[in-house]
Curated annotation (Swiss-Prot):
It catalyses: agmatine + H2O = N-carbamoylputrescine + NH4(+). Keywords: Hydrolase. This is Putative agmatine deiminase 2. Transmembrane segments: none annotated. Its EC number is 3.5.3.12. GO terms for molecular function: agmatine deiminase activity; protein-arginine deiminase activity. It holds the Pfam family PAD_porph. The active site is at C356. Belongs to the agmatine deiminase family.
Length: 369
């Protein structure tokens, strides 16, 4: 158990698709008052609902700061493991480890650099040192060896893989000046191929409109299965999201995956624009060094930001008529999984959604055929 030399691609380790079997899910309990309104209490209820929903299908571990341990333990059912772990905020998908498996039933992690989505240039909070230690701590907890790439800034929400050699990301995020400004697009792509063991990287131009993380791919795109994808969509041509989604569609429609398959693309219509209310804005404490959210600001509300669990899809609800449409499409796309909707406005107010606040632990016995 410790830091490894070498590269995953040389050692035969790959990142599996999220739809492959899991042995668990990690989350972090929200609390910081400059991001979560009313001291995080409303968001904690949303996180609890997500954790309970996932726990019906796979084990859930909730990491929580020392200040919130008693509260989280009281709020969460005994079926959810609660472990004390210092943190700066509650987005484990972004700074938890990337988990890799091989065909021998072994698992390893990757510890990437994290700088709060842009560092001192356009990051969302400072400091971020506690978050930057979480990947290594989780690997230690799970007794996993890990590769360290601390000089390379990468968030888990910025990439999606199909487990069969294809990775999708956005130029808006990975080429942003606050991430890896000294690396070229080709150099970034080479790193992705070496550490995720993929043969093809597909670059979408942009992520979801006004996504404050510089356009994470998980808010606009997801793999349903190898060769089959879902894309956030709107038919409203006056909405800036329309041109973004259309551009993504055109890129995907003219690409093949690493196996040479053309993509079957499903359009998952996003809700009508969701805006922050005055009351919600006033409930967040204003602190220097954090990114303020004002009344009337549009939030990046997308149904694509869902979690694929063992036997289930946990997706966000926005109290919009399209909630029902999203449920119906997901039921068609995942006939063998239960589709569970969770009201997720409080998570959205914090800057992300269900996929962002969860990190799956793959089943290390997953073997590629």
């Amino acid at each position: 158990m410790g830091q490894l030399k070498g590269l995953p691609v040389e050692d035969g380790f790959r990142m599996p698709g999220e739809y492959e079997p899991h042995i668990g899910c990690f989350m972090i309990w929200p609390e910081r008052p400059d991001n979560w309104r009313l001291g995080g209490k409303p968001a904690q209820q949303n996180y609890k609902e997500v954790a309970v929903a996932i726990s019906n299908f796979e084990p859930v571990t909730m990491f929580v700061s020392p200040n919130q341990y008693k509260n989280a333990r009281k709020e969460l059912p005994d079926t959810i493991r609660v472990i004390e772990m210092s943190n700066d905020d509650a987005w484990i998908r972004d700074y938890g480890p990337s988990f890799l498996v091989n065909d021998k039933g072994e698992m390893r992690g990757v510890d990437w650099g994290f700088n709060a989505w842009g560092g001192l240039l356009d990051g969302l909070y400072f400091p971020w040192d506690k978050d930057n230690q979480i990947a290594k701590k989780v690997c230690d907890l799970e007794r996993l060896d890990y590769y360290s790439q601390k000089d390379f800034i990468l968030e888990g929400c910025s990439i999606h893989v199909d487990g069969e050699g294809t990775l999708v990301t956005t130029e808006e995020c990975l080429l942003s000046e606050g991430r890896n400004p000294n690396l070229t697009k080709i150099e970034i792509e080479q790193t992705l191929k070496k550490y995720f063991h993929v043969q093809k990287v597909i670059w979408l131009k942009h992520g979801f409109y006004l996504d404050e993380t510089n356009g994470h791919v998980d808010n606009i795109f997801n793999f349903v299965a190898p060769g089959e994808v879902v894309l956030s969509w709107t038919d409203n041509k006056s909405d800036p999201q329309y041109e973004i989604s259309r551009e993504c569609y055109d890129i995907l429609a003219n690409q093949t995956d690493a196996k040479g398959r053309t993509f079957m693309i499903h359009k998952l219509h996003c809700p009508d624009p969701v805006l922050i209310t005055q009351t919600e804005s006033e409930g967040v404490e204003a602190i220097n060094g954090t990114f303020p959210r004002q009344a009337g600001d549009r939030l990046a509300a997308s149904y694509v930001n869902y979690y694929t669990a063992n036997g289930a899809i946990i997706f966000p609800l926005f109290d919009d008529p399209k909630d029902k449409d999203a449920q119906e499409l997901l039921e068609q796309l995942y006939p063998d999984r239960k589709i569970v909707g969770i009201k997720a406005r409080e998570i959205l107010l914090g800057g992300g959604n269900i996929h962002c606040i969860t990190q799956h632990l793959p089943d290390k016995s997953t073997i590629r055929e």
